Amino acid sequence: MTKANMQRQDTRYVALLLALAILMLLVPRVSAAEYTASGATKFVFTDRVITVTEGNYTGYKIEGTELTINGAGTYIVSGSCSDGSIKVKKGTTGVTLVLNGLTLTSAATAPIACNKSTEVNLVAASGTSNTLTDSAKNNDDNYPDNADAENAVLKCKDGSQVTISGSGTLKIIANGKNGIKSGATTDEEGTASLTIRNVNLTIHAPVNDAINAEQTLNIESGTTPISAADDAIHSDYVLNIG
């Protein structure tokens, strides 16, 4: 890529960010109840294990530093882990996943993956800072032997309906490919959508897109500083802002 092309891309991103900033100022911030902590099941990540405080919701499985959610409920995650992941099992609905001061890195896959036909509200809890990071290996173009590659830090697969909300902060660092990847609507998996609402979301994507959505992308409110090597925001179908 020539220096002139890089300058044109930088200008494009700056213009996009300015436009988004103006739109966000015009949209009133929503004051919504983020989640109900009472009865929630709580997890704390470390580099070696995940510890759990039982609540009312038992739809989960732990293997080492891998957490799988397979039942509806409110699940609160915190702590720090240099190689771990959270997955919401295919077809699981009614999930509220609360990031309550979580720093989660994955060495080969997506730190958080919402599998096909899931319904997930991902909440950055008030007063907390949360960071999700992947590695260069989370890219099956460059690492075709990595069967676990999801090509995004936050992967939302076909038919998934995911909302990112909360008054805390969420930082996404995409060393593999995309920051957030949202899948498609299909007859088999159902309707897909990604909604960003009332959250302080920062995305650094030095390899590809910051946000890549194959279906409906709703950016309703909040602040979203973005840097990306390719598209800051890419939507194949419908992009709604405000």
Language model features with spans:
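A composition-driven surface/loop motif
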Residues: 13-16, 28-242
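Generic low-polarity alpha-helical segments
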Residues: 1, 22-23, 32
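Hydrophobic core
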Residues: 18-26
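Generic N-terminal leader/processing signal
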Residues: 1-3, 198
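Bacterial N-terminal signal peptides that target proteins for export
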Residues: 3-16
